[in-house]
Amino acid sequence: MSHNVTPNTSRVELRKTLTLVPVVMMGLAYMQPMTLFDTFGIVSGLTDGHVPTAYAFALIAILFTALSYGKLVRRYPSAGSAYTYAQKSISPTVGFMVGWSSLLDYLFAPMINILLAKIYFEALVPSIPSWMFVVALVAFMTAFNLRSLKSVANFNTVIVVLQVVLIAVILGMVVYGVFEGEGAGTLASTRPFWSGDAHVIPMITGATILCFSFTGFDGISNLSEETKDAERVIPRAIFLTALIGGMIFIFATYFLQLYFPDISRFKDPDASQPEIMLYVAGKAFQVGALIFSTITVLASGMAAHAGVARLMYVMGRDGVFPKSFFGYVHPKWRTPAMNIILVGAIALLAINFDLVMATALINFGALVAFTFVNLSVISQFWIREKRNKTLKDHFQYLFLPMCGALTVGALWVNLEESSMVLGLIWAAIGLIYLACVTKSFRNPVPQYEDVA
């Protein structure tokens, strides 16, 4: 019995419709630039008012991993992302476990975004049952993803542009306030980056929290099979998404830090967005921004929905998941329809699910993917392809991915205990499932050979 799934020339495949700009917009929508207002209070408290520097540290750390993604996308332009890279570069067993763990990140991300939207709606319209909002939003998200990835990309492009415009408007009000004497009282200051009471360790601690603001930049690697010239476009898109997102975070928090030099004005620093809107722009603007925040989390949910459906499609095509369901592509829409519907059904759990638990699941999956993408570069290029002869080889295929792995290691150290426990339980379930698929590992792990 063969356990390698060979390509079928008559099978329905995903349609290539995306170019660089839509892919970057998908990544930025996933990241949600507006999240900078949510995390500002807690990180400002941790760093004694040096949030921009913490973001700079986080950006540098993330860019190492972004470079690793770029190298592997050129080698394996498949929709499977970290799953495919670990499968081909290290081993099919490791690849499955990475893919299984990554499902925690991707599978629950749409639900978390719907859950956040539900929370916003409950604050705006408490008289309407929240389950109605959840069902309506999930139906909208699923319908868009079913029809085409291009429509999702177009929707997300509009939302990202509007987010940037809204951030610019808020920053305009912040600048005006500082100019009129609020906060630091000056627009030119090095204090948001460094001051006499600055300490590196708290900034690194803040950076570990802010790194999770970048979660999602990697998800666009799942769009490789629907992107024209993916070997060139996807690596650039991944790097640009992380870089542009990071620059927005640093630029915006510089001015916010001038307006709020410390956290003394915040009643609840852990949920600073509503208070920032209230202090800077007033009650009416706060309500409007809350409504728009609902739309931004929906856009992020749509991007996550698209990504996980394609990861499940690749795992189904490989045969590690039932192929007839997970490997199905709709003949007209050319989308993984069954997976999209399944993810939509899981997102309905937002009707009654704990946000803290869902977030814990996501963090574990993201760190597994980041770690093994960096290790896959070393395994594939430095070890397997023996690109270890020159100083340039050592720098590109050993030093840079090692830096990426070490920076991710700092995130592992700061991972919540609940994330680790839930993640390990999920990994154990995956290992048991894999043992069943391979008949106690006597048979090889199924894999699709078209990408090698």
Curated annotation (Swiss-Prot):
- Asked if the Swiss-Prot or TrEMBL record annotates the protein with the keyword Transport, the reply is yes
Keyword Lipoprotein listed:
no
What does it catalyze?
A: putrescine(in) + H(+)(in) = putrescine(out) + H(+)(out)
Periplasmic side, ranges: 38-48, 117-123, 180-199, 259-283, 416-417
Q: How is its activity regulated?
A: Putrescine uptake is inhibited by carbonyl cyanide m-chlorophenylhydrazone (CCCP), which dissipates the proton motive force.
**What keywords does the record list, in alphabetical order?**
Amino-acid transport, Cell inner membrane, Cell membrane, Membrane, Symport, Transmembrane, Transmembrane helix, Transport
The cross-references to Pfam families, in alphabetical order and at most eight, read: AA_permease
One example of a Gene Ontology biological process annotation: amino acid transport
Sum up the protein's function in the record's words: Putrescine importer. Required for induction of type 1 pili-driven surface motility.
Family the entry assigns: Belongs to the amino acid-polyamine-organocation (APC) superfamily.
Indicate what this protein is called per its UniProt record: Low-affinity putrescine importer PlaP
Task: Please give the organism.
Answer: Escherichia coli (strain K12)
